[in-house]
Amino acid sequence: MDTRGCAWLLLLLSLPQGQSHQPLHRSKRRWVLTTLELQEEDPGPFPKLVGELFNNMSNNVSLIYLIRGPGVDEFPEIGLFSIEDHQSGKIYVHRPVDREVTPSFMVHFDAVDRSTGKVVDESLIFNIRIRDVNDHAPQFPEKEFNISVKESQAAGQPIFQLLTVDLDQENTPNSQVLYFLVSQTPLLRESGFRIDLISGEVRLSGCLHYETAPLFTLIVRASDCGEPSLTSTATIHVSVEDSNNHMPTFMEDRYEIRISEGQVEQGVLYLPVQDGDSPFTPAWRTQFNIWDGNEEGHFDIVTDPETNQGLLSIIKPLDYESQVAHSLVVVVENQEQLFVCTEGQLQPLRKAMASTMVSVQVLDTNDPPAFHPQSFIVSEEDGAWPAIQLGYFNATDPDRADSQIRYKLVHDPENWVTVDEKSGVVTTKKQIDRESPHVNDSFYTIIVHAVDNGLPPLTGTGTLMLFLSDVNDNAPTLRPHSRHLEVCESAGSQPLLIEAEDADLDPYADPFTFDLDNAQGDVEETWMLRTKQGEGHSAELTMLRSVPPGDYLVPLFIADRQGLAQKQTVHVRICSCRSGSECEEPSDTWLLWWALSPVGAALMVLSAALLCLLRCSCTFGPKRLRGFIPSDSGHQTLIVYNEESKVPSAQGCDTFFEPRGVKTLLSSTPVYLDRMVPRQQPLQLLEGRVVEAWSQKLQSIDVLEGDTGYLPHVYREEGECEGAETLSSLTFLEQDLSPKLLGCSGSKSTPSEAMCFTSRVPS
């Protein structure tokens, strides 16, 4: 094709003239250029003339024509265009051009004075267009497509759309694409496909049948409208998804089962079904329902996910006396709606169900007694006395009217009531207290069993909820932390918080009234009690004057809203504080609490046991002499003075601990002495030390009963002291001396004892 165009482009340019008295005339300049147009992929030969350019100023000035821009000295395609003769302005192309890469070139043309090299006219910008040829076929994004279509797909609806790309110039026949269905495998009369010529949409014609053809293969062609026409093909694999076109059916029209009354059982009957659709798909899975006969809710049916069968269960016990037989209508349907295709046309989707009959025969068994009602509420006042009839239980045997029923009390944690075995009458036997820990929200629960005389005996359960209305039977009391208070001597005027509590309910509880008990006459002079504002259960105790450190008892009365009061005592300890906030020494109250605590009690019991063992040790052995033991005789020590007299016989006294107390020294309590000096073991040493420690503590307590601040007092006056008499003046008979006198006098008196009594020994 000739690359020269048939149109000429005329560009008129004007130059201003110099000033003169003559009218101004505009000089015209013109570019004369043939239309520059190239054919895509021109085979040549090259270089090939594209066109010529001419400027009318060349009539007066020798010109040189220059070109520049894309295709000449700029990207893309550098060196594609050139001017062979600068004077004639002929333009050449040197190689083929791909329009899809560069559809046009913007080239600049200049006219230059050959002698001066100056540009004599404005540049001409010209668009060199590349004329398209049909050199690209339509292209599919993929060679093969895999799609799936439901078996219930309606005919005429698009199931897929093909899209192609043609790189030729848009809006020309070279890029216009048409679509054709080349083949379909398998080719069925009732199931087919078609493709839209322009849009490429694939549509279904007729109805699909999964069981007949689960897979189709379509070959399609895309062709452009160029000359010559170019084409490409693609393959579509259509998978058919099974839908519900087979209704489930029961294997039997009727089923019969026998069930004992009073039972709850899972899976008493399996109902198998048949379905021609693909297993484990929504078209195959079943849903069972009891259409009729289950008005009381005794039965339930579910689907076994593995076998697709129905499982009938008893979820509520059957009663033979109420109904001996049940007839159930069970229906089954698929999870997916059923579709039907008639003469190539899909019918509207609908629900389709199959049904069967299930006959249930109830077998009679021994039923437990039934309470009427099973649970009831009885109201009674708090503090009700014994012998009050609260109510009665009524139970019957559903099996026989003449059945003998016995009532048995099984839950009465406070042992408040009795239940008559025959009549079921509930009577109080103890006074009732609403403050019992077994009373929850004013309700006390009593549970009774009714036992029949069947084989085997069965039991029914009835409940009596005893509601106890509160009465004002509890006066307010101090809370445990308010009974013992401590305050530093320096902070004596600081109020002490006192809180009270009441076991009764409103209106027999707070707000409380706090008053001091001034029976002794001096309480109000020392203390002031004021109810705390905004709180009905607390008050503030304030010391009005300074008192010495010590323990003080503050009596007071606390009354509830109804005026029921009770005397209480607050133990206040005033102490010296080192840091200003804590007492230096613990209160004696804590010693009392320690003594009463389990640990203190255990230690006291252990000490008593050790004392008992010591007592037994002192009283066991040969004859004992009563007498006073001097304090300088030593503790468990044998005294030896290197005597040269007769060797004494083995004798000794029981070891003991000397109490260090005034009361002990002045008492005449006898001491039992042993003649043997046992070798003490470690346990005995421990016992002795414990006994000594406790004895000293007890004796010190006895001595300190009085006020230690007083000087010693004379408790007995025996007259003036007389002079001592000589031994010869002492008159007493030998017979008056006890033979046991020297039994514990030590080794120093033993020889003398032998000499004194020698005359009495028979020769």
UniProtKB/Swiss-Prot annotation:
Residues 612-763 are cytoplasmic. N-glycosylated. This is Cadherin-like protein 26. It comes from Mus musculus. Homodimer. Component of a cadherin:catenin adhesion complex composed of at least of CDH26, beta-catenin/CTNNB1, alpha-catenin/CTNNA1 and p120 catenin/CTNND1. Keywords: Calcium, Cell adhesion, Cell membrane, Glycoprotein, Membrane, Metal-binding, Repeat, Signal, Transmembrane, Transmembrane helix. The keyword Metal-binding applies. Its main location: membrane. Glycans are attached at residues 56, 60, 146, 394, 440.
